[in-house]
Amino acid sequence: MGLPIVAIIGRPNVGKSTLVNRLAGEQTAIVHDEPGVTRDRTYLPAYWSDREFQVVDTGGLVFNDDTEFLPLIRQQALAALHEASAAIFVVNGQTGPNSADEEIAEWLRQQPVPVFLAVNKCESPDQGSIQASEFWELGLGEPYPISAIHGNGTGELLDELIKHLPPVTELEENNEIKIAIIGRPNVGKSSLLNAFAGEERVIVSPISGTTRDAIDTFIERDGQNYRLIDTAGIRKKKSIDYGTEFFSINRAFKAIRRADVVLLVIDALDGVTEQDQKLAGRILDEGKACVVVVNKWDAVEKDSYTIYDYEKNLEARLHFTEWADTIYVSAVTGQRVEKILELVTKANEEHKRRVSTSVINEVLEDAVRWHSPPTSRGGRQGRIYYGTQVSTQPPTIALFVNEAKRFNDNYRRYIERQFRQQLGFKGTPIRLLWRSKKVRDVESGSANRATRV
């Protein structure tokens, strides 16, 4: 992306994520009093003294333990260092150096990037200098006493850091498409992201809940830039403790809001679940473009009716996103994965599309001719005066009528179907705003008002 990268390294629970949030000016990396909360590489933009760069939050390093995720976390930290221009090694000033710090320091001395030693949790400036002095023994140069929570000392650290960052020679205007990858735990979201990125960017494991942060990955295809946001799987509320998992779900919903297009990942073996339906409803509520990705398609036993039956099931159970394209893929084998980005680009274009008022009213005129608006019990018929598009993302059309409450849900759905049949809008929700307007207000409008239906 053109910006230098700074990797944040350290053993568990020394305050790496807190420092990342301090440098980035926001709480995006999950911070919780539990060792090993951050498992993946989380990229955030940072800015200091007219210099822009990215900070990369990595999992807590442990070298003498190979249980559960720890070897994978080491792999992620090494990958972060390989793409970094510098590293900040975070240690705990309150506990002093220990054997784990010494192991990490020895490992960092073998890496080809400059390393800056941040002695965190030095809340008192006077006492902090004494605490930091104990870390000279790690052999990484000057220890910088800091408080990631309060910001003390971070300025001095950053002043020295930016001296070692390479200049940004060219930073192009980036017209990127932001994509949120969401779904229940263990449906293959991280495998899908890695298939896009061409590397093991995110820890992949059959253990549910492996990915906890919303993580941004940048890729480019055919001149188009994409920002991929992988999120923790979304579980039913009753199975969530109000700890780290709660914050991850909140982060996933925020990722939907950030996105231009959402990939709703369905497990082909499990089919559409109640939780998938709720996610589809969330996408609709947020007004986001969507592509439904049925993953693990390679594991499904197939006959000549399989795809037909599956499509019927999706249509029946995912009615919230019936307007979305569906693609059947295997993130493991790579089957049809690249095709997803084509659908994303198309959905994004439809999401931002604007239609002229004259075309909208031609559609309305045809729709009313084929199916007249409903009539009230008193014999008064509903009447659509005109329509005009008032916004995009999602496309939103205001319909001015004689009495909005006269138009029941069935007729409103009929009008939406007519817009879709005539104008497309594949991959994006559309919103219709029904507005009551008196006849005299319509007739006294300016000469430039929309064509009356």
UniProtKB/Swiss-Prot annotation:
Record text on subunit structure and interactions: Associates with the 50S ribosomal subunit.
SUPFAM superfamilies recorded: P-loop containing nucleoside triphosphate hydrolases
One GO biological process term: ribosome biogenesis
Residues binding GTP 2: 183-190, 230-234, 295-298
Identification of the protein by name: GTPase Der
This protein's encoding gene: der
InterPro entries noted in UniProt: G_ENGA, GTP-bd, GTPase_Der, KH_dom-like, KH_dom-like_a/b, P-loop_NTPase, Small_GTP-bd
Domain EngA-type G: 4-169, 177-352
Organism of derivation: Nostoc sp. (strain PCC 7120 / SAG 25.82 / UTEX 2576)
Keyword match GTP-binding: yes
Role played: GTPase that plays an essential role in the late steps of ribosome biogenesis.
